[in-house]
Amino acid sequence: MSAKDVKFGDSARSKMIAGVNVLADAVKVTLGPKGRNVVIDRSFGAPHITKDGVTVAKEISLKDKFENMGAQLVREVSSKTNDIAGDGTTTATVLAQAILNEGIKSVTAGMNPMDLKRGIDIAVKTVVENIRSIAKPADDFKAIEQVGSISANSDTTVGKLIAQAMEKVGKEGVITVEEGSGFEDALDVVEGMQFDRGYISPYFANKQDTLTAELENPFILLVDKKISNIRELISVLEAVAKTGKPLLIIAEDVEGEALATLVVNNMRGIIKVCAVKAPGFGDRRKAMLQDIAILTGATVISEEVGMSLEQATLQDLGTAHKITVSKENTVIVDGAGDAAAIAERVQQIRAQIEESTSEYDREKLQERVAKLAGGVAVIKIGAATEVEMKEKKDRVDDALHATRAAVEEGVVAGGGVALVRAVNALEGLKGANEDQTAGINILRRAIEAPLRQIVANAGDEPSVVINAVKNGEGNFGYNAATGEYGDMLEMGILDPAKVTRSALEHAASVAGLMLTTECMITDIPEDKPAAPDMGGMGGMM
C-alpha cells in the first residue's frame, strides 16, 4: 500500500479552493450571450472549440492532487446538473464557486461549518420554492423557440428547428441530433412507428426505383417465433388473399420453405406480401411486438399463451393506413389500434421509466413511448468544417435538453434575473442560531454571481447592472446581448425553471460538503528509479 499525504483544516481547504477556482474560472468565461470560446487541445486531430460548460469541465485535470480533488468535486456539480436538466452547467459551476468563496470567509472567521451548511440548505429550499411559484408554463411554439435559442447561445435558427420538431412529434416524441452532410441545418420527421428492421428478402420490394415495399391498408400478422413451415401460414394466406389486401408478417424470422413460398406468391401477384424480422432481442422483442399489436389492433400469435399460427384468423390480424418497408427500416403509419389501449400502454411504459435505474433502459423505454405517442424527429446539423460541426452539435444538444426541461417545469426570467429576484424571498429569513443565519446570508450574496458573470463577459460593469436590476420589479432585467434593460420574458430571454433549480441545488450541495471538509488524503507519488542504460552497444560510434 502506497504512503498517503494528509492535510488538515485551512491548509486542506485552501488547496481545494485553489482547484475549484481554476476549473470554475475556465468554465465561467462561456456564460451568457457574449460568453467566450474555450479551445481544448486534442492529442490527435484538430483542437476542439466549445462554449459548453460541461465539456470544458470534463477536460480539466490538475497536477496537484489536492487541488485536483477540489476541481473534480465541482466538475461533479456540472455533470449532475447536465444529467438531470441537460443544461445550466456553467450556472451551477459559477454558483458553487460563489457559495464556496463566500462560505470559506465565515469558516476562517471561526463559525461552525455544519451550521453554515444548514443555513445554506434552508435558504436553497426557500429559493427553489420561490422559483417554482413564479415559473410560467412553456407550452406554445414561441416560448419553446425562445428557450432553445437562449440555450444554443442566442442562435435563433436552432431554437426554430427544435420548436418545429416538438410541434411535429409532440412533447413525448423522440428528437435526436445527428451530424448532417451539408452546410444547412435540416429537420427530418418520421410520423408513425419506425423500427430498425427491413425486409427479409429484396424480392419483397414492389417499388423498384426506391427499392421499398409499400403496402396500402395491409393486414399485419405478428408472430413471436421462427416460421419455416409454410403449412402453418396457409390458412392465414388464403383468408387474406380473398380480401385482396396486402399482408405484412413480423416474426422472429421467416426462412426455408416458408420464405420461398411467400417470395414466389408475391412475385406472381397472387398475394402482395412482405416479411420482416421483429425488432429488438429477448424480452425487449416481446415488449415491442406487444407495442405493435396495440398500435395496429392485432394479437401476437404466441405459443406461450396457447395460440397456434395454424389456427390464426383475420380477427387476430392488425391493420394500418400504410406501411413502408425499406432494406433497413419499417414505418407503420396510422395503425388501427384503440386510442384508449394505446394511452394505457404509454402510461404503463412511463411507469417503467420511473422505476428503471439504467440510463440505457430508460432511453429505450422513452423511444417506445415516442413511437406509440408521437413520432421521431432528427435534427441534422450543417457546418463548413468538422470543428464547427462538433461545437454546434454541443450547443444543439444543450438547447434540446433545455427545451424539454422548460416543457416539464415551465420557464422563469433568464439572464440570472430569477435568482436575483429570489433574494426577496430570503428577506427576514433566520436560522436557529447566528451561524445558520450567516449561512442564509452566504447564499443571498452568492445567487447574484451568475448575473455578475454574464455582465462581466459582456464587458459591462456588474455592480451597476446588479443595482439597476435590484431596483426593478418582476421580470425586469438586463439583456447582455444588446445592453438594454427591460422585461426579460418580452425580450424572449427565458430559462427553464428546472435548469435554474437544479443548478442551485447541486451547487449548494457540493459547496456545503466542501465547507464541512476538515481533512484531505491522497497518495504520495512514488519516485521510480530511472531506467538503466542499454548495454552491449559498444562500437556504435
From Swiss-Prot:
Keywords: ATP-binding, Chaperone, Cytoplasm, Isomerase, Nucleotide-binding, Stress response
Reaction catalyzed: ATP + H2O + a folded polypeptide = ADP + phosphate + an unfolded polypeptide
EC number assigned by the record: 5.6.1.7
Keyword flag Iron: no
GO biological process, one term: protein refolding
A cellular component term, taken from the record's GO annotations: cytoplasm
Binding site for ATP: 30-33, 51, 87-91, 415, 479-481, 495
Record localization: Cytoplasm
PANTHER family cross-referenced by the UniProt entry: 60 KDA HEAT SHOCK PROTEIN, MITOCHONDRIAL
Family of the protein in this entry: Belongs to the chaperonin (HSP60) family.
The protein's name: Chaperonin GroEL
Organism for this UniProt entry: Acinetobacter baumannii (strain SDF)
